[in-house]
Curated annotation (Swiss-Prot):
Role according to the record: Converts stearoyl-ACP to oleoyl-ACP by introduction of a cis double bond between carbons 9 and 10 of the acyl chain.
SUPFAM superfamilies in alphabetical order: Ferritin-like
Cofactor annotation remark: Binds 2 Fe(2+) ions per subunit.
Protein's name according to its UniProt entry: Stearoyl-[acyl-carrier-protein] 9-desaturase, chloroplastic
Known cofactor(s): Fe(2+)
Transit peptide: 1-30
InterPro entries named in the record: Fatty_acid_desaturase-2 (IPR005067), Ferritin-like_SF (IPR009078), RNR-like (IPR012348)
One GO CC annotation: chloroplast stroma
Self-association and partners: Homodimer.
Lineage, top ranks: Eukaryota, Viridiplantae, Streptophyta, Embryophyta, Tracheophyta
GO BP field: fatty acid biosynthetic process
Family matches, as PANTHER family: ACYL- ACYL-CARRIER-PROTEIN DESATURASE-RELATED, STEAROYL-[ACYL-CARRIER-PROTEIN] 9-DESATURASE 5, CHLOROPLASTIC
Length: 393
């Protein structure tokens, strides 16, 4: 689930900031900007600061009156969103797909797993590890959802449908990192200590989705991300099958199925917002796309590579696990899913936002084609996750 948004493809898309819309509250607070350390100014990197700059952060941008919309949707969410959760007793668990340590055949099962993994290329493991690390940063994602005004879990055990969804979604997602982590541990193909360090760094750094405590922006972001993870895990499943590890293909495939179900829930929320507030919602979609959807693990660091996420995402792009084309395809899918082209009765700003969003995917594709044509072969980069081996970018 990776893509480099510092690439020429995305830098070339010029964006202009629109004037303050009805979506934004006049009461907006700016958090400080974290600057990366530099030799020139003598700064020393702080141990718990993100590996790269975090944008100037806007907070609480949703006008207070918009909160009433989410309060009014409690009954709808009960009947239409919580149905996309599975009862715990019907959910798969990581142990269903792993060698059973209580069985007499445990050692033989581990040997079989390691044998299957022997011929899988290192670059595939780089991408699989990156996906697993992204899943393991789950505490950050629950934290992010609980920053959203009007839908956060106010008590830690709130019984509003929004809070129930966030906790249960987190519980379902928790199985993904558990399963991939244990499979990779048993494979013997990766440096688990370096991976564990990367996870700790990532959770400590957090994420910067630029959702502004605004549930409009937050649910648009999660709609995009769940589809991105569905695509990414689906492609790692396909690659595992091609490399002959059918069990690993099953593992990645079952995770992809969860992501698809979660995508359905989040896209339904945004669909409902389009129904009750089309102008505010299309402005929010345009806002998120102007800012560009950053991947959840964009602050990834392993203690060695300051450009780890960029390198990981480049390998994912080369292998076709998650690409710039996928980014454009997701946008196009959501535009169709939410029927943005058919929106009527919009304000002047709403019309501009609709036209911008509907025309963006073709522009991204054209820019990516040009970037690929100009792309130069990059030197291989060592990845600590695979014991410092050089991996082609």
């Amino acid at each position: 689930m990776a893509l480099n948004f510092n690439s020429p493809t995305f830098q070339s898309i010029k964006t202009t900031r629109r004037p303050c819309s009805p979506l934004r509250s006049p009461r907006v607070f700016m958090a400080s900007t974290l600057r990366p350390p530099s030799v020139e100014d003598g700064n020393v990197k702080k141990p718990f600061s993100p590996p790269r700059e975090v944008h100037v952060q806007v907070t609480h941008s949703m006008p207070p009156e918009k909160r009433e919309i989410f309060d009014s949707l409690h009954g709808w969410a009960d009947n239409n969103i919580l149905v996309h959760l599975k009862p715990v007793e019907k959910c798969w668990q990581a142990s269903d797909f792993l060698p059973d340590p209580a069985s007499e055949g445990f050692e033989d099962q581990v040997k079989e797993l390691r044998e299957r993994c022997k011929e899988i290329p290192d670059d595939y493991f780089v991408v699989l590890v990156g996906d697993m690390i992204t899943e393991e940063a789950l505490p950050t994602y629950q934290t992010m959802l609980n920053t959203l005004d009007g839908v956060r879990d106010e008590t830690g055990a709130s019984l509003t449908p929004w809070a129930i969804w966030t906790r249960a979604w987190t519980a379902e997602e928790n199985r993904h990192g558990d399963l991939l982590n244990k499979y990779l541990y048993l494979s013997g193909r990766v440096d688990m200590r370096q991976i564990e360090k990367t996870i700790q760094y990532l959770i400590g750094s957090g994420m910067d989705p630029r959702t502004e405590n605004n549930p409009y922006l937050g649910f648009i972001y999660t709609s995009f991300q769940e589809r991105a993870t569905f695509i990414s895990h689906g492609n790692t499943a396909r690659h595992a099958k091609e490399h002959g590890d059918m069990k690993l293909a099953q593992v990645c495939g079952i995770i992809a199925a969860d992501e698809k179900r979660h995508e359905t829930a989040y896209t339904k929320i945004v669909e409902k917002l389009f129904e009750v507030d089309p102008d505010g919602t299309v402005l929010a979609v345009a806002d998120m796309m102007r800012k560009k959807i950053s991947m959840p693990a964009h602050l990834m660091y392993d203690g060695r590579d300051d450009n780890l996420f960029e390198h990981f995402s480049t390998v994912a792009q080369r292998l076709g696990v998650y690409t710039a084309k996928d980014y454009a395809d997701i946008l196009e899918f959501l535009v169709g899913r939410w029927e943005i082209e058919k929106l009527t009765g919009l304000s002047g700003e709403g019309h501009k936002a609709r036209d911008y969003v509907c025309g963006l995917a073709p522009r991204i594709r054209k820019l990516e084609e040009r970037a690929q044509a100009r792309a130069k072969q990059k030197a291989p980069v060592p990845f600590s996750w695979v014991f410092g081996k050089d991996i082609k970018l």
